[in-house]
A protein has these predicted regions:
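Catalytic core of non-heme Fe(II) oxygenases with the double-stranded beta-helix
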Residues: 82-85, 92-245
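Non-heme Fe(II)/2-oxoglutarate
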Residues: 6-103
Length: 245
């Protein structure tokens, strides 16, 4: 269902990987066709988008945790439902576990003496989200992700080449330059002025960015620079996270 062979792993300032050609072409083409319309009312602002005083996100989402219409949307999308069920499966957990171990990242120490499968079954869930960020200034401010997250996978679902080249549409992997933000496990939003970009990950078709939640897993998106041609376009992606119960 997914292919992790064409991957590159990084360790500084925290572990992350870039995987190209993650899906077979036929599957990816179907995902592009089936991606829900971001203008549909079934999409809702992220919680942080509603809290303007925080100013953390400017994005919309449809997910399996909080969106009431998620099951109605996905049940009529054959390929999307197929990959959703795959990402929720133990097979996916095992594939990711083996991938991490092969790249010297071991999160098995969390399990103590319990069965690995039982440990994940009882203690973790998989979060699945259709994400949409407006291309006319949309952004995700620097943050390290919720303490409940263990692993995050971001997969662009795009079919327009011009979106990939927009300034700010990729993901910036960051390092805090202000010492008070160096330890940020609880996911405090960090001013861009207090960060330094370590690596910029282009937002490319059929690619996956995967990173491990740490106290310093700082990253951001945008603000995406708009043009007269992109005001109605969206940065569409599927996000999959392994999260603590």
């Amino acid at each position: 269902m997914i292919n992790l062979k064409n991957s590159e792993f990084f360790y500084d300032p925290y572990p992350f990987a870039i995987v190209k050609n993650i899906f077979e072409k036929e599957i990816y083409d179907d995902l592009k066709k089936e991606f829900p319309d971001p203008n549909d009312t079934k999409f809702h602002p992220s919680d942080y988008s509603k809290k303007k005083d925080i100013g953390k996100f400017n994005k919309f989402q449809l997910d399996n945790f909080l969106s009431e219409n998620f099951n109605d949307v996905i049940k009529n999308r054959k390929t999307s439902k197929l990959i959703y069920n795959f990402f929720k499966s133990e097979k996916f957990i095992n594939i990711i576990d083996e991938f991490l171990i092969s790249n010297h990242i071991n999160i098995r120490s969390l399990k103590k003496k319990k069965s690995w499968k039982n440990f994940f079954r009882k203690n973790f869930k998989v979060y699945f989200e259709f994400s949409s960020i407006p291309c006319d200034g949309g952004f995700i401010a620097p943050h390290t992700d919720s303490p409940y997250k263990i692993i995050t996978c971001v997969m662009p679902i795009i079919d327009k080449d011009e979106i990939s080249n927009l300034k700010g549409i990729g993901t910036s992997m960051l390092e805090a330059t202000n010492i008070k933000y160096k330890y940020n496990y609880l996911n405090q939003a960090v001013p861009v002025s207090d960060t330094r970009e370590i690596k910029y990950i282009n937002f490319l078709p059929n690619q996956m960015l995967m990173f491990i939640k740490t106290y310093n897993s700082l990253h951001c998106v945008g603000p995406i620079e708009s043009t007269s041609l992109t005001k109605s376009l969206n940065r569409k992606s599927i996000i999959v996270c392994i999260v603590k119960e």
